Amino acid sequence: MITIQPEIEILSTESYEDMLRRIEKIGRVCYKSEERIGEGTAEKFIAGIIKRGHESVIEHGSITVKVTCDRGVTHEIVRHRIASYSQESTRYCNYSKDKFGNQITCIDLATGFSYDLNDENDRKKYEVWQKAMEAAEQYYFQMLELGAKPEEARSILPNS
């Protein structure tokens, strides 16, 4: 299991080609296929998502803010559709595959709650959280080993 810091990245375009590349970059987040981005791949990818009816990704042709945060936070903001949202799909992404490093990724609790890891109580809370995340990862992979689909095993993953 790895922990990462929350972050925000504002993406903007200056040309038609840049806009297509940005739509592809954000669209591929949903399928966790960013490694397939290459020279000339954007138009084909966009045609494919349109064919599959995933048109909301096209809305990223205006302005896009990539937010790396807790899944619980995304569940709050996507309910208020004042913009277009695309997020990594735990339904389709199988974290036991090599492209994920065979591990889940969790947003670091200590950062979000400003824990002082030199403080004994904060450190103990953080250690309990870390053990819970590691257990969730273990049971997620166990479900997959038992033949569960990613969309079944995802119910074990942390959401807030």
Q: Predicted regions span which residues?
A:
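Family-specific signature for flavin-dependent thymidylate synthase
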Residues: 1-160
